[in-house]
A protein has these predicted regions:
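Multi-pass membrane proteins that catalyze or facilitate reactions on polyprenyl-/lipid-phosphate substrates
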Residues: 1-236
Length: 236
């Protein structure tokens, strides 16, 4: 049970780190959403905040559906499958090296809702352990022609509903809080928050410089190591 509480704290720390880093985008999106409720057509065509808010909603639908129906089946995924998923993620990330040749969409309004749905489906695939959520969503966004900065920002904006949903699903499994060691939660929360801030800044910096594909090498190496470890254990 303490492990479950620790996992929840990790999710919450990551959630808070994302909010801090992308607070301006979040505030503009929330503001645009409520203003757009008064005039949907005009806001959808002219208000960037509302447009992004609507895009976030659309992109969140696939992961909500997949997560709801498959969540209980994914916790015991075999180790070699996780290794293979990491290798798949790494391969896709490496392909983003050539996205500079793809015509870039000039602004948010050039991004179609079909594009957004594809990014949402990419996020849904990340319910499978070993598939990187940000890796998949940013990669697909780049393949679809979103500029690097917005691809990263949008990827982490749509992560917020997904992380919040994961928190809710985890909280329902908590039973007697009195039996938990709160120190686990505090350590997990602080650690994930601090490292989340550092990781987000580092990733966005690499992305803006066109070096996002470098993370593909990391995923490939870890994936191969996990798979080889599984083979070694299985043989012995």
């Amino acid at each position: 049970e303490n492990i479950l509480l620790f996992e929840i704290a990790l999710h919450f720390g990551t959630f808070l780190a994302t909010i801090i880093i992308f607070r301006e985008d979040i505030l503009n999106t929330i503001k645009g959403f409520f203003l757009g409720l008064k005039d949907f057509k005009n806001a959808n065509e002219n208000d960037e905040g509302f447009r992004i808010a609507f895009m976030v909603i659309i992109a969140s639908i696939p992961v909500a559906i997949v997560g709801f129906f498959l969540e209980k089946y994914l916790s015991d995924l075999p180790l070699h499958r996780i290794g293979l998923n990491l290798i798949i993620t790494g391969s896709i990330l490496l392909l983003t090296k050539n996205t500079d040749k793809i015509p870039i969409k000039k602004d948010v309004f050039s991004t179609t809702y079909y594009n957004v749905l594809m990014i949402g489906i990419a996020q849904a695939l990340a319910v499978f352990p070993g598939i990187s959520r940000s890796g998949m969503t940013i990669s697909v966004a780049l393949f679809l022609g979103l500029n690097r900065d917005f691809a990263g920002r949008f990827s982490f904006l749509i992560s917020l509903p997904a992380i919040f949903g994961a928190l809710i699903l985890s909280l329902k499994n908590l039973k007697d809080l009195k039996s938990f060691d709160i120190s686990y939660a505090v350590i997990g929360l602080i650690t994930s928050f601090v490292f989340g801030i550092i990781a987000l800044k580092f990733l966005m910096s690499f992305l803006r410089k066109g070096k996002f594909f470098h993370f593909g090498f990391y995923c490939m190496i870890v994936g191969i190591a996990v798979y080889l470890y599984f083979i070694t254990v299985a043989v012995n």
